[in-house]
């Protein structure tokens, strides 16, 4: 949740990890995503939460975390030792180089490491350049999210000239097409085909 220092499990506000575990049991969860704000802003609590969930549910309980902070690479081992399975980096300003050493450390620590970005149609060339740059990074995946127009961002989206792609989705026009284009470039590269 943005700008508040509270823990939630689904939509339930939790004061303790016991409440988080109770919620996970109630929904028969097989894993959990750790989001924010940014979980690194409460690093010790995040590490404790990872450790507690793994201890309670076992090694098969998949834990992934989202962050936009290029944290000290030495922390990667702490997250791996606590039980973090996967980390997804949101690259602020699309400045991948700031994240290189952290990404490498996470991968080397055995954490499945990837990048997750919104496909902003007005940043097409920057995103295609980023895609090329990331070829030299030690990542296992890249998630491309459709840019959504929401109550919280609609004024900014309007200023940037975005419209809804259809009446049945909150996706910005052109975002899905950009994601598919980027995906086809990655697939072509994997097969050593021109993109």
Residue ranges and their predicted role:
Residues 13-14, 43, 69, 96, ...:
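A conditional alpha-helix N-cap/helix-loop micro-motif detector
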Residues 15-38:
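Short Fe-S-cluster ligation motifs
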Residues 26-27, 58-60, 190-193:
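Short helix-terminating capping/connector loops at secondary-structure junctions
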Residues 30-33, 46-136, 140-143:
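Radical SAM/AdoMet-radical enzyme domain recognition
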Residues 37, 92, 147:
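Flexible loop residues that form catalytic
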Residues 40-41, 95-96, 122, 150-151:
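Short secondary-structure capping/turn micro-motifs that flank functional sites
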Residues 101-195:
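Conserved C-terminal portion of the radical SAM core fold
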């Amino acid at each position: 949740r943005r700008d508040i220092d509270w823990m939630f499990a689904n939509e339930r506000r939790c004061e303790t990890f016991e409440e988080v575990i109770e919620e996970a049991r109630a929904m028969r969860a097989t894993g959990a995503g750790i989001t924010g704000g940014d979980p690194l802003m409460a690093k010790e609590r995040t590490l404790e939460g990872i450790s507690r969930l793994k201890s309670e549910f076992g090694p098969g309980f998949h834990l992934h975390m989202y962050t936009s902070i290029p944290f000290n690479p030495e922390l990667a081992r702490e997250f791996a030792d606590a039980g973090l399975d996967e980390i997804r980096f949101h690259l602020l300003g699309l400045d991948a180089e700031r994240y290189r050493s952290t990404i490498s450390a996470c991968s080397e620590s055995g954490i499945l490491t990837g990048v997750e970005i919104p496909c902003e149609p007005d940043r097409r060339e920057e995103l295609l350049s980023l895609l090329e740059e990331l070829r030299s990074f030690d990542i296992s995946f890249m998630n491309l999210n459709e840019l959504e127009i929401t109550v919280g961002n609609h004024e900014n989206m309007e200023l940037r000239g975005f419209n809804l792609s259809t009446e049945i989705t909150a996706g910005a026009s052109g975002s899905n097409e950009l994601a598919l284009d980027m995906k086809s470039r990655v697939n072509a590269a994997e097969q050593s085909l021109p993109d």
